[in-house]
Amino acid sequence: MRLGLCVVALVLSWTHIAVGSRGIKGKRQRRISAEGSQACAKGCELCSEVNGCLKCSPKLFILLERNDIRQVGVCLPSCPPGYFDARNPDMNKCIKCKIEHCEACFSHNFCTKCQEALYLHKGRCYPACPEGSTAANSTMECGSPAQCEMSEWSPWGPCSKKRKLCGFRKGSEERTRRVLHAPGGDHTTCSDTKETRKCTVRRTPCPEGQKRRKGGQGRRENANRHPARKNSKEPRSNSRRHKGQQQPQPGTTGPLTSVGPTWAQ
């Protein structure tokens, strides 16, 4: 009988303890939830007393601000300068630009606006526009200079050397193009209109007729180049006499007679 009473007493005490513990736990949960709802700022769905907001509303962006050794979350409608917005289904975040002197960026490595007095060129910030680029008139952005409009290159011409197409093995060939439009009409700012490259062909002898024409042309050019040399030559005199012919003595006239050997009678 006593044993039965002891068992009943133990069961009743255990039930009382279990009910009391559940009540205490429920009260503690309600107290934490109430404190959390009071500490979270407007637009924050989940927050912590130590780290601030942990999750913002869907239309807001969470920004982690450093406070000593902690990072505190803040909900903002847009990201501040030096940050770009990264949207994802879980939560929108503000991520800091990693480009030096950048005020606004499209991604962590592509700037869209530099700090004051700096020039923007291909997603980077510079104190001056790089070589080969110029600043726009009303912005601090560097761009390529106005380009000339050029025609297509012509086919490569035949391989030649000194305007000859034969008698050589190594020569050159060229191709050309035209300027269709130049900014301000200044063609000097445009690219080259002629290109030349070396070429090698199988050596072929020039035709005989071409050689003769070249030789005759060379003689005519020499004659035209040195006309005094031809006039300086004196005509050959008829002073050459046949062997044995006697010249007339001064003061005598008449034909010359041959002087032959005299034979004794």
UniProtKB/Swiss-Prot annotation:
FU repeats lie at residues 34-85, 91-135. Gene3D superfamilies: Hormone Receptor, Insulin-like Growth Factor Receptor 1, Chain A, domain 2, Thrombospondin type-1 (TSP1) repeat. GO terms for cellular component: extracellular space; nucleus. The keyword Transferase does not apply. C-, and N-glycosylated. N-glycosylation at Asn-137, negatively influences its secretion and enhancing effect on Wnt/beta-catenin signaling. C-mannosylation at Trp-156 by DPY19L3 is required for its secretion an regulates the enhancing activity of Wnt signaling. Pfam families: Furin-like_2, TSP_1. Expressed in the dorsal part of the neural tube on 10 and 12 dpc, especially in the boundary region between roof plate and neuroepithelium. This expression is enhanced in the rostral part. Also expressed in other tissues such as truncal region neighboring forelimbs and mesenchymal tissues around the nasal cavity. GO terms for biological process: male meiotic nuclear division; positive regulation of canonical Wnt signaling pathway; positive regulation of non-canonical Wnt signaling pathway; positive regulation of Wnt signaling pathway; regulation of gene expression; regulation of male germ cell proliferation; Wnt signaling pathway. Residues 245-257 have a biased composition (Low complexity). Residues 173-192, 201-265 are annotated as: Disordered. PROSITE patterns: TSP1. Residues 147-207 form the TSP type-1 domain. Disulfide bonds join 40-47, 44-53, 56-75, 79-94, 97-105, 102-111, 114-125, 129-142, 148-190, 159-166, 199-206. One of its GO terms (molecular function) is heparin binding. Residues 1-20 form the signal peptide. Keywords: Disulfide bond, Glycoprotein, Heparin-binding, Nucleus, Repeat, Secreted, Sensory transduction, Signal, Wnt signaling pathway. It is found in: Secreted; Nucleus. InterPro entries: Furin_repeat, Growth_fac_rcpt_cys_sf, R-spondin, Rspo_Fu-CRD_dom, TSP1_rpt, TSP1_rpt_sf. Glycans are attached at residues 137, 153, 156. The FU repeats are required for activation and stabilization of beta-catenin. Interacts with ZNRF3; promoting indirect interaction between ZNRF3 and LGR4 and membrane clearance of ZNRF3. Identified in a complex composed of RNF43, LGR5 and RSPO1. Interacts with the extracellular domain of FZD8 and LRP6. It however does not form a ternary complex with FZD8 and LRP6. Interacts with WNT1. Binds heparin. Interacts with LGR4, LGR5 and LGR6. Interacts (via FU repeats) with KREM1. Activator of the canonical Wnt signaling pathway by acting as a ligand for LGR4-6 receptors. Upon binding to LGR4-6 (LGR4, LGR5 or LGR6), LGR4-6 associate with phosphorylated LRP6 and frizzled receptors that are activated by extracellular Wnt receptors, triggering the canonical Wnt signaling pathway to increase expression of target genes. Also regulates the canonical Wnt/beta-catenin-dependent pathway and non-canonical Wnt signaling by acting as an inhibitor of ZNRF3, an important regulator of the Wnt signaling pathway. Acts as a ligand for frizzled FZD8 and LRP6. PANTHER family: NEUROHYPOPHYSIAL HORMONES, N-TERMINAL DOMAIN CONTAINING PROTEIN, R-SPONDIN-1. Belongs to the R-spondin family. This is R-spondin-1. The lineage of its organism: Eukaryota, Metazoa, Chordata, Craniata, Vertebrata. The gene is Rspo1.
